[in-house]
Amino acid sequence: MITQKGKEHLAKDKQNIYLRILSGIVLVPLFVIAILWFKPLFYILMILVGMGMLSEWYNMTYSSIPYLLIGLIIIPIPISLLTFLSMEDTNRWLIMLYFCIIWSVDSFAMIGGKTFKGAKLAPKISPKKTWSGLVTGVLSAGLVAVLASFIPNFHIENYYFSNKIYLFIISCILALIAQSSDLFISYLKRKFNIKDSGHIIPGHGGVLDRFDSIILTAPVLFFISIL
């Protein structure tokens, strides 16, 4: 029998999912347009994302100079690398694929965790994350990447991304790193007693909550892209 507190928790989770969907309806088309057809908009979005992440990082870590300084390094780097990659027209599908991977792993990990449940991934850092969610998210992200490669006019010059087998493997690796990046931010939020880094994005929290995965994945993407 579900208690009143349990019912309230389920209702809150349901509302959160609806808000995530609504946010996605706005954010996803905006980024697709920016990446594929209007490069200046992507630059603006990256600047806004970077500013938002830095602002929320400061609000979270201002009491600790070492952690504050870490943010001044690890946030500008991925923003700069993604912006640099996007300057080359031939990389537009690479950037598009990248966001498909890091966003799909987050969504499918949540769905997989709620569906299959099971052992917790890191109960002290992020109590809601499960091993089943991680596996579901990583494999789904790899599948999404392969399916995306069949879109008409899809083309990535890099061999490792154009080969379907390598694409699946690399996408799974990026998805796994994205989850590690998410856990890193979750650890910091626990350390500094913060539930969400902000509230600007409905259903997600702050900019840092939504884009935390780029911190570790963007450098990896850049490295693979120049091989």
Swiss-Prot record:
Pfam families tied to this protein: CTP_transf_1
EC number annotated for this UniProt entry: 2.7.7.41
Main location: membrane
GO cellular component, one term: plasma membrane
Pathway: Phospholipid metabolism; CDP-diacylglycerol biosynthesis; CDP-diacylglycerol from sn-glycerol 3-phosphate: step 3/3
GO terms classed as biological process: CDP-diacylglycerol biosynthetic process
Places the protein is found: Cell membrane
GO molecular function, one term: phosphatidate cytidylyltransferase activity
Sequence intervals crossing the membrane: 31-51, 65-85, 93-113, 131-151, 165-185, 206-226
Membrane disposition: Multi-pass membrane protein
Family annotation (InterPro entries): PC_trans (IPR000374)
Record's catalysed reaction(s): a 1,2-diacyl-sn-glycero-3-phosphate + CTP + H(+) = a CDP-1,2-diacyl-sn-glycerol + diphosphate
Sorted UniProt keywords: Cell membrane, Lipid biosynthesis, Lipid metabolism, Membrane, Nucleotidyltransferase, Phospholipid biosynthesis, Phospholipid metabolism, Transferase, Transmembrane, Transmembrane helix
Record-stated family: Belongs to the CDS family.
Protein name: Phosphatidate cytidylyltransferase
